[in-house]
């Protein structure tokens, strides 16, 4: 519960900081080479659609874990969250999110982040995307200390619904998890 409150506090602080900036130059205090990052995040936050995230599956790579270890892991990564997202002028997707889900040990793991996907349209209603996510998360097995991460991200968009996945790399017995989540744009 403390992690969820911390996550929500971070989001509120970022929102308050964004609200304090003037609308004519929301990123005026940023270092010049980071201004495009700030401007895209600001655009996503102010112009993006509201999203509801839900998660449900975390597949542990059978080639890197012993069968008895896999049996002890939770692969039902139930959870959810909220976000904002938009398709930019080139048709690529940008998203901000805050989620919490059950990790491999059935502990709640919160995460806040930004994701970018280069997309290709299959037809009017279907798009596929490939990109990355940068995030901050915390885990019980790391003493709940927040730490940053960057992960690959793929998604299939159909109208207002999305199925996405990321692969958390690792070594033998750690990481190597395919995490699948969904999103509905409200």
Curated annotation (Swiss-Prot):
Provide the catalytic activity annotation.
a lipid A + a 1,2-diacyl-sn-glycero-3-phosphocholine = a hepta-acyl lipid A + a 2-acyl-sn-glycero-3-phosphocholine; a lipid IVA + a 1,2-diacyl-sn-glycero-3-phosphocholine = a lipid IVB + a 2-acyl-sn-glycero-3-phosphocholine; a lipid IIA + a 1,2-diacyl-sn-glycero-3-phosphocholine = a lipid IIB + a 2-acyl-sn-glycero-3-phosphocholine
Entry's InterPro entries?
LipidA_acyl_PagP (IPR009746), OMP/PagP_b-brl (IPR011250)
Active site located where? 60, 103-104
From the UniProt annotation, give the residues forming the signal peptide: 1-18
Where does the source fall among the domains of life? Bacteria
Documented EC number(s): 2.3.1.251
Q: Its principal location?
A: membrane
Q: What's in the GO CC field?
A: cell outer membrane
Q: Which GO terms describe its biological process?
A: lipid A biosynthetic process
Assigned keywords, A-Z: Acyltransferase, Cell outer membrane, Membrane, Signal, Transferase
Which GO terms label this protein's molecular function in UniProt? acyltransferase activity
The family database entries (Gene3D superfamilies) matched by this protein are listed as: 2.40.160.20
Its subcellular locations are: Cell outer membrane
Site label Role in lipopolysaccharide recognition, positions: 69
Function according to Swiss-Prot or TrEMBL: Transfers a fatty acid residue from the sn-1 position of a phospholipid to the N-linked hydroxyfatty acid chain on the proximal unit of lipid A or its precursors.
Please describe the quaternary structure of this protein.
Answer: Homodimer.
Q: Which family does it belong to?
A: Belongs to the lipid A palmitoyltransferase family.
UniProt-recorded name of the protein: Lipid A acyltransferase PagP
Species in which this protein is naturally found: Legionella pneumophila (strain Lens)
* Upper taxonomic lineage: Bacteria, Pseudomonadati, Pseudomonadota, Gammaproteobacteria, Legionellales
């Amino acid at each position: 519960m403390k992690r969820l409150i911390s996550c929500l506090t971070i989001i509120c602080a970022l929102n308050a900081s964004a609200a304090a900036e003037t609308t004519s130059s929301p990123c005026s205090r940023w270092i010049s080479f980071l201004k495009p990052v700030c401007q895209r995040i600001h655009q996503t936050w102010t112009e993006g659609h509201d999203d509801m995230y839900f998660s449900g599956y975390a597949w542990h790579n059978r080639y890197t874990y012993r069968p008895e270890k896999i049996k002890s892991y939770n692969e039902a990564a139930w959870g959810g969250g909220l976000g904002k997202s938009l398709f930019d002028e080139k048709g690529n997707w940008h998203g901000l999110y805050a989620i919490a889900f059950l990790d491999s040990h059935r502990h709640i793991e919160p995460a806040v982040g930004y994701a970018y996907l280069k997309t290709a349209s299959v037809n009017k209603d279907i798009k596929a995307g490939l990109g990355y996510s940068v995030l901050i998360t915390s885990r019980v097995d790391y003493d709940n200390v927040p730490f940053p991460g960057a992960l690959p991200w793929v998604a299939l968009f159909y109208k207002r619904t999305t199925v996405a996945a990321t692969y958390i790399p690792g070594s033998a017995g750690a990481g190597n998890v395919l995490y699948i989540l969904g999103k509905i744009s409200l």
